């Protein structure tokens, strides 16, 4: 899986696709743990649909990155995405920011 990325110092931002579901979950998880940076921000603003497989891929990626000394944080201003994170209580596991810039700055 290839997704658009941006690098800000030791942080890489990954922009997710419109759908993050079962078809994309394995590829997303593999991508996130093989990046050249260990501090990752996942930008969910373009994502309209995310299911349990997609959420699990994010959670597993965060766990793997933390084992490697990094972290994974989320950025989204989209209310439906924020609601899903709240309903699944993943907003307690992840640091969730309104903007990519705020998420990147949190690593400093």
Where are these regions (language model features)?
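Short beta-strand/loop segment at the start of cytosolic alpha/beta domains
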Residues: 1-15
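Conserved catalytic submotifs in the C-terminal HATPase_c
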Residues: 8, 45, 101
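A charged, well-structured terminal subsegment
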Residues: 96-108
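Generic intrinsically disordered, low-complexity segments enriched for polar/acidic and small residues
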Residues: 5, 91-94, 104
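Amphipathic alpha-helical interaction surfaces in cytosolic regulatory modules
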Residues: 22-94
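Short, flexible loop segments at the rims of nucleotide/cofactor-binding pockets, characterized by
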Residues: 16-20
């Amino acid at each position: 899986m290839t997704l658009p990325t941006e690098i800000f110092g030791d942080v890489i931002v990954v922009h997710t696709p419109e759908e993050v579901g079962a078809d994309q979950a394995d590829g997303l998880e593999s991508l996130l743990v093989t990046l050249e940076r260990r501090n990752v921000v996942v930008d969910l603003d373009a994502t309209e649909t995310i299911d349990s497989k997609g959420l699990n891929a994010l959670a597993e990626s965060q766990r793997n990155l933390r084992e490697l000394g990094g972290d994974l944080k989320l950025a989204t201003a989209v209310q439906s995405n924020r609601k899903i994170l709240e309903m699944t209580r993943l907003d307690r596991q992840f640091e969730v920011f309104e903007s990519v810039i705020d998420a990147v700055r949190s690593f400093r």
